[in-house]
C-alpha cells in the first residue's frame, strides 16, 4: 500500500487531463458506433448523479459509511474509462463496486447480505444481482483496474487543515458537502485529493461570507428591505474577491508571487445564482433558523468581517504555498457547472435510458 498520494498508483495511473479523459471515452464509443447511436445516454454528470443516488439507497440499507461510497464511486469512474458503459449492467457494477469498496475501506460485508439487500432495492434486477454475478463482476472490476484499489480521498486533507484555517464546524460541514458532491463529477480523475479539498474549503468560505453579508444587509434594512435568502447565492463575486485577495497578498513585501493567478478566472454573469443540492439547501435553511434564534452577541461571531478574515487568511496561505491555484479554480468551476447541470437532471429519463440498453442486450 502506498504510504501517501505522491507514491500511489492513483497519482501515476489514474489522473488524466480533460483531453485524455475525453479521448478515452471517445475511443470506447468508436469501438461500436452503432451501439452508441442506438442507445443514447445523458451526459456523464447526469449518470454520476444517478449512480450516486442508487448507491446511497443501498448504503442506507447496509449502514455503509460515506468513505466507502466515495471509494465505490471512484471505482466506477475508473472502470468506465476502460469499459464502454453500454456493454455492462450499471446496477450490477455499482453494487459490486460498493461491495469491493467496503472490503478496501475495512468494513467488509458478506456477499450474501449485499446480494439480498440489492434485490430489495432493485427487485426488477434480481437475476442480475445473484451472488455468482456479483462475484464474477468483482473479478472484472479488479482486472480492469489492474488491481490498483487504493483510493486517496480529500477528506483527510480537509480534517488536517480545519484547525490551521480556523474553520468553524459549519465551515467544515459545508466543505464536506462539496467533497461529497465532487464525486458526481470527473474531478477524482482530474486532480489530486488535496487540490479538491482546498477548492471545497474555498467554496465553503465564499458561501459563508456571502451568507453572513446577506444576513447583515437584511438586518440593516429591516424596514422595507428585501429579505436575503440562503439559496440564491452568487459565487462569481465571491470567487473574484478571493482572486483579488490572493493577488494582493502576492504583491505585498512578505508575499510570494503566484504565476497561476495571472490567468483570469472565467466568471459567469454576476446576476446568475447557482442551485445547490437539496442537502445543502436543507443545511443552509437550518443554519439560518439557528442564526435567527441566537442572541445578538452570538450573532456577532458570524459577522461578515470575521468571515472575510477567514477567506483572507486562506488566500494568504495559498499565495505563499506551492499549491496550483489555477487547478483549484478549475475545480470550483467544475463544481459550479455540476450544480447548474442539476437543473436539467431528470432521474426518470436517466433510468429509462439505462434500462433500455440493459434489457435490449440482456445484460
UniProtKB/Swiss-Prot annotation:
Single GO cellular component term: nucleus
Positions with biased composition (Low complexity): 277-298
Subcellular location: Nucleus
Bias type Polar residues, positions: 265-276
Keywords annotated in UniProt: Activator, Cyclin, Nucleus, Repressor, Transcription, Transcription regulation
Record bears the keyword Lipoprotein: no
Listed InterPro entries: Cyclin-like_dom (IPR013763), Cyclin-like_sf (IPR036915), Cyclin/Ssn8 (IPR043198), Cyclin_N (IPR006671)
GO function term, MF aspect, one: cyclin-dependent protein serine/threonine kinase regulator activity
Region (Disordered): 252-312
Annotated family: Belongs to the cyclin family. Cyclin C subfamily.
Name used for this protein in its record: RNA polymerase II holoenzyme cyclin-like subunit
Source lineage: Eukaryota, Fungi, Dikarya, Ascomycota, Pezizomycotina
Amino acid at each position: 500500500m502506498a504510504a501517501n498520494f505522491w507514491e500511489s498508483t492513483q497519482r501515476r495511473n489514474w489522473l488524466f487531463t480533460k483531453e485524455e479523459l475525453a479521448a478515452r471515452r471517445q475511443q470506447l464509443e468508436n469501438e461500436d458506433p452503432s451501439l452508441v447511436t442506438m442507445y443514447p445516454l445523458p451526459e456523464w454528470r447526469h449518470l454520476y448523479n444517478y449512480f450516486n443516488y442508487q448507491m446511497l439507497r443501498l448504503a442506507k440499507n447496509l449502514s455503509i459509511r460515506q468513505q466507502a461510497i466515495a471509494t465505490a464511486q471512484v471505482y466506477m469512474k475508473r472502470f468506465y474509462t476502460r469499459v464502454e458503459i453500454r456493454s455492462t449492467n450499471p446496477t450490477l457494477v455499482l453494487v459490486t463496486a460498493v461491495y469491493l469498496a467496503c472490503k478496501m475501506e475495512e468494513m467488509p460485508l458478506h456477499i450474501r447480505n449485499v446480494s439480498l439487500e440489492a434485490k430489495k432495492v432493485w427487485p426488477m434486477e434480481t437475476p442480475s444481482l445473484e451472488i455468482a454475478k456479483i462475484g464474477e463482476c468483482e473479478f472484472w472490476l479488479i482486472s480492469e483496474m489492474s488491481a490498483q484499489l487504493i483510493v486517496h480521498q480529500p477528506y483527510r486533507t480537509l480534517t488536517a487543515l480545519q484547525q490551521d484555517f480556523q474553520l468553524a464546524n459549519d465551515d467544515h460541514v459545508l466543505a464536506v458537502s462539496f467533497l461529497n458532491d465532487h464525486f458526481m463529477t470527473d474531478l477524482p480523475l482530474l486532480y489530486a485529493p488535496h487540490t479538491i479539498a482546498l477548492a471545497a474549503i474555498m467554496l465553503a468560505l465564499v458561501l459563508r461570507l456571502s451568507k453572513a453579508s446577506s444576513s447583515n444587509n437584511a438586518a440593516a434594512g429591516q424596514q422595507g428591505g428585501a429579505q436575503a435568502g440562503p439559496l440564491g447565492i452568487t459565487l462569481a463575486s465571491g470567487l473574484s474577491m478571493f482572486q483579488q485577495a490572493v493577488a494582493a497578498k502576492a504583491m505585498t513585501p512578505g508575499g510570494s508571487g503566484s504565476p497561476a493567478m495571472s490567468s483570469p478566472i472565467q466568471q459567469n454573469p454576476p446576476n446568475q445564482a447557482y442551485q445547490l443540492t437539496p442537502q445543502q439547501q436543507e443545511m443552509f435553511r437550518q443554519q439560518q433558523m439557528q442564526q435567527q434564534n441566537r442572541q445578538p452577541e452570538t450573532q456577532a461571531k458570524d459577522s461578515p468581517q470575521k468571515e472575510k478574515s477567514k477567506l483572507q487568511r486562506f488566500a494568504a496561505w495559498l499565495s505563499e504555498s506551492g499549491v496550483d491555484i489555477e487547478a483549484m479554480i478549475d475545480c470550483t468551476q467544475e463544481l459550479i457547472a455540476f450544480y447548474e447541470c442539476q437543473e436539467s437532471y431528470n432521474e426518470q429519463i436517466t433510468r429509462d435510458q439505462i434500462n433500455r440498453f440493459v434489457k435490449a442486450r440482456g445484460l
